[in-house]
Amino acid sequence: MEKVYYFDNAATTFPKHENVYKAMDEANRDYAVNAGRGAYALARKASEVISETRQQIMELTETENVAEVVFTASATLACNEIFGGIDWEKKRTVYVSPFEHNAVMRSLFLYQKRYGFLITELALDEKGMELDQEKIRFQFMREKPDLVIMSHVSNVTGYILPIEEIAASAKEYEAIVVVDGAQALGLVPISLKNSPIDFYVFAGHKTLYGPFGIGGFIYHSKYRLKHMIAGGTGSDSLNLEMPEEGTVGYEPGSPNIVAIAGLHASLEERMTYLKENADYFLDREKEMTEYLIRQLKKIFGVTLYLPEHLENHAGIVSFNVEGYQAGEVGMILDQDYHVA
C-alpha cells in the first residue's frame, strides 16, 4: 500500500503504537477468555488486565478512591447508558454546548421525545467560536439547569471548553454535569478528584490511542444510574436483578478483553510521558497545529475556523477552500497527494 499522510485523527488516531498491536495479539492468542467467569489462571489474567486498566484511567484522572470507571464498547454507548440511566421525571431544562457530537445529541433527543424536557444551547461569544461564561451564568439564573452537557474538546474546531468553570456554575443549581471527553482524555490534562463534573465519557480509540471497541465513563460513586442493559455479570447469578454495587451492574456481557489489553498498553506508553509532564502531548500537538495554521494562512482562498484564543485550542483545524466543497478538497488531497 502507498504511503498515506494521515490527518483524520479527530475521527480516530492512527496508527497506534506498536505496543498496542503486540498487546492485542498476545491477548488474542494467550488469554482471550471470559474474565470473571472462572477461577482458572487465564480468567484471572484477563481480570487482572481489566482491573489494571481501570486503575490507569483513575490515575490519569486522579480519581482513585473517589470515582468508578465503567467500560463500554464506545463513547457513544457510554452516552446512551448515562442518559438512559438518569431519572428524567423531574428534569425540565437541559443545557448543551453548541459543539456536541451526535453521540450526545441523538441519544439525548431520544429521551427528549419521551419526556419533553427543554434543550437549550449554552451561549456563545459574539464571534461564535467560544462559550461566553458571563452569558451562561445569566442563562442559569433565568432558567435553572437540571442537566448540563459539554464536550471537553470540540471535534470540529478543536476548542477546549472551560468545563470546570461552567460545571461549577451549574452546581450552584445542583445540576448534573456530563462531559464528553472523547477528544480530550490522554491529551488535555484533567483532574476529576474534587471536580464538579459528575460523569466524564471517554473513547479508547481517539486521544488515548487505543483500539476500537472500548470506551466508557467515569462517575462519582454518589450517583446510581438506572440499568439500561441487563445480562450476565459472572456474579450473583441466581438473582435476576442487576447488581447494584460497584461497576459490574453497568457492564453486562463478556468484556472485550482484547480491546482492553490494547488500551492498557497504550495507557502504559502514554503515561510514561504524562507522569513527567501532564502537558507533554498537548504541547507537542499545539506546536504542530500552530505550524499548520501558519502554512494554511499562506494559501490564497483558504478560510480557517479557529477559536479567538489559541491557548484554548487543541490539534483540530477546520478550513474551507474557496470554490470547492469540503468533500471535493478531501478527495483531491486523497487522490493526488495521499493525504487522509
Q: Residue ranges of each PLM-predicted region?
A:
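Pyridoxal 5′-phosphate
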Residues: 1-340
